[in-house]
Amino acid sequence: TKKYELGYKAEDTNWLKTSSGEIYYTNLIEKLIAIIVNKIALLDPCQMGIEMEANRAGWNDACNGLPSLFGSGMSENFEVARTCHFVKDVLTKYSNHTITVPEELFELYAKVNDSIATCSSGFELWDALATARETYRDKTCYSISGQTVTMDIPDFIHSLDIYINLLSDGVIKAMQLGDGLCPTYFRYVATDYEIIKENPNG
């Protein structure tokens, strides 16, 4: 399989590699951009919290496993917003520099922005973001192409403003839901679903 071709081993430190097997080197601003874009792609169906994906967000044991499968946390909303503000301030000071990111990350970034601009409802946006996120994960599961794209800093600063407004709107919704107090976690329940089996025979 792909992971063995690239030399990945369970007991080793496995660095991110390109499709040719070379270790991919990055920098802090690129990592922060990756975090921001991925977290925005994890907004819940109401665009309030950041989805937990069955993890233990904030070390809250009550949200282990199933409760957090469709759950989200407001604490990460605040952290992502703070990161957006920080990166915006830095990029504004160094707007004459250039930033390159892996083409897979840039594709996710473009799809996130397009989804925010075109989706008419919260659920539609959630579905579009989830689809973009899963496509990105499939492409980067074991490696990336190694090709990079140069980002336009003013355009990304504009995107950060959009993300900040989206997160702020989520805080307002959460405060309304909590009668003036901001809830910490949300749990969503699937009311309609289809069971998909990988093995058609059971």
PLM feature spans:
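Acidic, mature catalytic/reactive cores of soluble proteins
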Residues: T1-G202
